[in-house]
């Protein structure tokens, strides 16, 4: 059983769009936001093409006042938010010692502070209603380190712990807060890394990912829809404070022995 209103941050395309589309098929009313009007318009057109009615809003989720105003507007125009998916995120691939503190803070602001701000805005109404679902989009980098992504890994590790803490503080109000940790997902942003090279070979990073993934492929955005629907439904009412890794098995796999 799916609740009525589902708000997804950053759901105009990619992973957020796939998750929201899956929830719409399960019966949710979709409310999404993005930082620019052009992205909201693009998202609305994509939902319409898919036969999904969606409500789109412009909002900078790092701005607490703007988020509070938007949540009040959504509650007035659509209704109380039953399900929140915190999907907005950025990454800066810069070696740590070359990254400025301002660049580090920018990643933390979007990937960690924003989920805190948005969750804080919707939880009071969930408490009043007596139930709620919060899904934070974490990452394999909530568990692993990798060169050039120190800010992203720090933020996603923090988001994992924020997920657990929301569970700890608000579980008694029938609010379930869980996370989804995607593996390497085939999106427009990763397309250049998956293109066949002029000599017919695979891109080195593509080879690396396929070798490291027991499923031997990149994930698809649609692979995340089912787990999100589960975590948003009554089927997960006793699941709280967990991160479900949808990674094709990377975190379980040490890799093959060199020949």
Question: What annotation goes with each model-predicted range?
Answer:
Residues 95-96, 103-108, 209:
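Substrate-binding pocket helix/loop in short-chain dehydrogenase/reductase
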Residues 119, 155, 163:
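Active-site helix of classical SDR
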Residues 124, 168-172, 237:
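Alpha-helical segment proximal to the catalytic Tyr-Lys
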Residues 139:
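Residue(s) in the substrate-gating loop at a strand-loop-helix junction
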């Amino acid at each position: 059983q799916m609740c009525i209103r589902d708000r997804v941050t950053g759901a105009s395309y990619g992973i957020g769009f796939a998750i929201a589309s899956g929830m719409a098929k399960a019966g949710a009313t979709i409310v999404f936001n993005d930082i620019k009007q052009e992205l909201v318009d693009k998202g609305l057109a994509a939902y319409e093409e898919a036969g999904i009615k969606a409500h789109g809003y412009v909002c900078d989720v790092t701005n607490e006042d703007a988020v509070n105003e938007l949540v009040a507007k959504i509650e007035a125009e659509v209704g109380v938010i039953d399900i929140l998916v915190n999907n907005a995120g950025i990454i800066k691939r810069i070696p740590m010692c070359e990254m400025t503190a301002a660049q580090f803070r920018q990643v933390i602001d979007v990937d960690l502070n924003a989920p805190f701000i948005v969750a804080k805005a919707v939880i009071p109404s969930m408490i009043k209603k007596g139930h709620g679902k919060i899904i934070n989009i974490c990452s394999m980098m909530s568990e692993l380190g990798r060169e050039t992504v120190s800010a992203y890994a720090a933020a996603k590790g923090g988001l994992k712990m924020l997920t657990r803490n929301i569970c700890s503080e608000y579980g008694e109000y029938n609010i379930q807060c869980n996370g989804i940790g995607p593996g390497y997902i085939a999106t427009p942003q990763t397309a250049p890394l998956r293109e066949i090279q002029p000599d017919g070979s695979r891109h080195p990073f593509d080879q690396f990912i396929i070798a490291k993934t027991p499923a031997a492929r990149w994930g698809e955005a649609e692979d995340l829809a089912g787990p999100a629907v589960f975590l948003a439904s009554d089927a997960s009412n006793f699941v709280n404070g967990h991160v479900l890794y949808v990674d094709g098995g990377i975190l379980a796999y040490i890799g093959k022995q060199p020949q």
